[in-house]
């Protein structure tokens, strides 16, 4: 055993990964090494047995208490019944869950991982922690306390370790350099390479845009798209999702390169990369700084703490302005003043590009640190809205565009890219199976779907109709206005299918019969009570996370109380029982 420290993360949106990256920076500042960092699925399991002594896992929970996609293989392995109970007896373990207590299966993933690893012989390194994002202290508050206990435990194991100077620039993790030859690559000549060279890797397929039409009225603030594309050999079911792989816009990449003159001079020279970070689908075969920033590195997301913790090292403090800017960036990269980072980056939704442009006068970033500094562009997931087809996919996508408190327009990286796609354009995508499954057993289905939550419900409804099933479907849909964002009017105008029962709520129409979906549900208490209690109906709830899923569940509890005469406790247990039996499912994002 070599005494290695291994940090593994399971992350769907990047939050858990960010804490893992930041923790590695913090441990390196104590000269603790070697330290490995990888997703749960990317780290070789054999090394956990042969090299790792101290295992740190940071993991979020997604969907119905599920492990993030980059941790599913790891979870499948450790759940094998034939594994010996002393397999990991050499490992000392601590875990950190990134969660939100508004979800029923709060921090469920890290609980499962921690419990199973302890069953396989792990010893406790420092106390586990389950952070709650909606608590007053937020995830940071939990993390600070957990990290302090972890570092104290590790320093006890490594008595020779000590805090090194904060001024020392850490060595880059990834090896990137510019070719010394005089060769330059014309971006127009390799425009297809980032797509073609990645096809087939990690299940990536080629999609061709068929339609990209606006569903909402032109005078409505929200642009919602009906996005259809074709491909070959498709295999999906209602509830499955598509991951789209967007890219940055040329004007943004140009602005970034111009902010660092030393980059602009070599922007189209071939790059030499070794020790790549993991990226779903891999990197393009032909890379320059320009193509790396366009197709692989996220320059439009909000900069995170680990970004600033490295960035401040590259500011020239020889002038008064430089010294002040370096100090400011250092504060943003520290946990000592978390509100400073929030006010600068999160509150105004400031992008990485905007940050670099603001500090460009005193900032010189070495090429060798680019992969350490910039996050990777993540694929974005969308629920499939079409009934199963081997040739086509339909998505319902809300375009992210809004003004911040500083009156600047912000646009989502993926939806801005998607909005500009035209029929015939090609792009990369992959399909993921979901636990949100439909089974035609003739029992009724109650569907609750405000806004774009309609997408997976549309897939299900269209399949039932196409198969001429006798299954009764009850859809409770919510939006703001009947005439502006009434998506079901676009999909089932003049519905004549006797199996499909539509009820709509319009929150901003003063003459609407129901304001919210929960109002419509409660108004149909007698019907829903009969469907649930007497006909074993299933309930599917889809849409934005937050208040909606919680209030819908409370409404179902009230309906059960009203229909059966149960008290509050028994009605809650009944709904929990439906969840445990797979008859009540939520898909919130």
UniProtKB/Swiss-Prot annotation:
Chief location category: cytoplasm
Domain of life according to the entry: Eukaryota
Gene field: TAH18
Entries under PANTHER family matching the protein: NADPH-DEPENDENT DIFLAVIN OXIDOREDUCTASE 1, NITRIC OXIDE SYNTHASE-RELATED
Domain FAD-binding FR-type positions: 202-439
Function: NADPH-dependent reductase which is a central component of the cytosolic iron-sulfur (Fe-S) protein assembly (CIA) machinery. Transfers electrons from NADPH via its FAD and FMN prosthetic groups to the [2Fe-2S] cluster of DRE2, another key component of the CIA machinery. In turn, this reduced cluster provides electrons for assembly of cytosolic iron-sulfur cluster proteins. Positively controls H(2)O(2)-induced cell death.
GO cellular component: cytosol; cytosolic [4Fe-4S] assembly targeting complex; mitochondrion
Cofactor(s) the record lists: FAD; FMN
HAMAP family cross-referenced by the UniProt entry: NDOR1 (MF_03178)
Name of protein: NADPH-dependent diflavin oxidoreductase 1
Any one GO MF annotation of this record: oxidoreductase activity
Cellular localization per UniProt: Cytoplasm; Mitochondrion
Location of the Flavodoxin-like domain: 5-151
UniProt subunit comment: Interacts with DRE2; as part of the cytosolic iron-sulfur (Fe-S) protein assembly (CIA) machinery.
Catalyzed reaction equations: 2 oxidized [2Fe-2S]-[protein] + NADPH = 2 reduced [2Fe-2S]-[protein] + NADP(+) + H(+)
Residue sites binding FAD per the record: 349, 380-383, 412-415, 589
Pfam families assigned: FAD_binding_1, Flavodoxin_1, NAD_binding_1
InterPro entries in UniProt: CysJ-like_FAD-binding, FAD-bd_FR_type, Flavdoxin-like, Flavodoxin/NO_synth, Flavoprot_Pyr_Nucl_cyt_Rdtase, Flavoprotein-like_sf, FNR_nucleotide-bd, NADPH_Cyt_P450_Rdtase_alpha
Residue positions binding NADP(+): 452, 507-508
